[in-house]
Amino acid sequence: MRLWFCLSFFIVLCLEHFPGTLADERNNRDYTIRTRLHGHHKPSRNNRYAIKTSIHGHHIPRNVPESEEKTEQFLRDLPKINRKGPRPPGFSPFRGKFHSQSLRQIPGLGPLRG
C-alpha cells in the first residue's frame, strides 16, 4: 500500500512539475506556448487577433474582404477545375496485372516493333 501511494504521488509530482501538463492546464490563462523560434511565452491579451506565423512573427490579418472574395471565386471555379477532360479510348486508371491488358486494347498500340 505504501509503495502504491509513493508511486502515485511521484507520478502526480512529475505531472505537476513538467510544463504542458496538469499545472499549466489548471492555470489556463497562464498556459505557456512553445514555439520553435521564441521558446516559452505567454499569449498576450490583445484584441487585435494576431496570427502567429513561423517565419515573420505576429501579423494582423489585412484585406480580409479580398481574401473572402478569392475564396468565393475559387469555390465557384471548383466544379470547372474538377471536371475531367476527355480520356483516350481504352484508358484505365488501374495499375498492375490489368494495366497491360488495357494498353493492348487501345487501337494502334500493339506490341513494340523494332
UniProtKB/Swiss-Prot annotation:
Composition skew (Basic and acidic residues), residue ranges: 65-80
Function: Potent vasodilator. Binds B1 (BDKRB1) and B2 (BDKRB2) bradykinin receptors.
Pfam families documented for this protein: Bradykinin
Naturally occurring in which organism (per UniProt): Bombina maxima (Giant fire-bellied toad)
Family: Belongs to the bradykinin-related peptide family.
Full protein name: Kininogen-2
Annotated spans, Disordered: 35-114
Arginine amide sites (modified residues): R113
Composition bias type Basic residues, residue spans: 35-45
GO BP annotations listed: defense response; vasodilation
Highest taxon, organism lineage: Eukaryota
GO cellular component annotations of the record: extracellular region
Signal peptide: 1-23
Lineage, top ranks: Eukaryota, Metazoa, Chordata, Craniata, Vertebrata
UniProt tissue specificity: Expressed by the skin glands.
Gene Ontology MF: a single term: hormone activity
Localization in the cell: Secreted
Keywords: Amidation, Amphibian defense peptide, Bradykinin receptor impairing toxin, G-protein coupled receptor impairing toxin, Repeat, Secreted, Signal, Toxin, Vasoactive, Vasodilator
